[in-house]
Amino acid sequence: MDVIAKTYANGFFKSFMDSTGGNTAVFLLLAGVVISVVIGYFLGSLNFALILSGKLYKDDIRKYGSKNAGMTNMMRTYGSKAAGLTILGDMLKAVVSVVIGSFIMGHIFGGYAAAFGCVIGHVFPAYYGFKGGKGVATAAAAILMLDWRAFLIVLGVFVLSVVLTRYISLGSVLGAAIFPLITFYSYHQIDQGRVYSGGWFAFMVALLIALLVIVKHHENISRLAHGKENKFSFKKSKK
């Protein structure tokens, strides 16, 4: 168990990096990060909203509602069962991605890289014409695996926003926006203000994930600004 925990924390490539050093170590670091991103991307491309709407309903969720292949549109179109299965699948692929990435290149470099790849895969899936969802559930599960304390704060912001406004999109945007701020603060505190490559890498990945989720909500943000955004409801619109 100690060996597994150590490999998860540092990554399989770490032992080779320690024994080589120099340019070879840098190459192994970059290779591990790239491999983690690629694995995360292809796992993330498994879009469960599209899989379930196709298998269970012989349909394409992107034809209905917001045209988004995600949990909220599945809820509005097919109901809570379909939405629950969607969020479970979209979160599970993020969990698997982070675990694999961590074993490859350690929790910081591998885990965060795989998480980023998974969110990109969900938003731009290779298997579905690069037209996927907005990455909220996938990003949430990735955050949980990367830093459970950050997840609790992000979840709190999301839930409070949705309870007060009933706008899923607003809660998603606010939750995404606060994630890189929490990540920056966490590693700044751990490192006591010193430049720490792993911490800065984690912050940059968190920032990219947040920006990706927020940009994918640009239409929702526009509707919110004009008071035209749909509020969340448990009622489905399609029989």
Walk through the language-model features, giving the residues of each.
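Transmembrane alpha-helix interface/packing and boundary motifs in multi-pass membrane proteins
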Residues: I39-S45, V119-G129, S161-I168
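Hydrophobic alpha-helical transmembrane segments
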Residues: L30, V34-V38, G84, G111-F116, ...
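Cytosolic, membrane-interface loops and tails of multi-pass inner-membrane proteins
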Residues: I51-K81, S222-K239
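N-terminal signal-anchor transmembrane alpha helix
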Residues: A31-L56
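Multi-pass membrane catalytic core of lipid/isoprenoid biosynthesis enzymes
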Residues: R76-G101
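Interfacial segments of multi-pass membrane proteins
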Residues: M75-Y78, G101-I104, G117, G121, ...
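Short, non-helical or kinked segments that cap or interrupt transmembrane helices
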Residues: D59-G70, Y127-A140, Y167-I178
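Short, strongly hydrophobic alpha-helical membrane anchors
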Residues: M1-L29
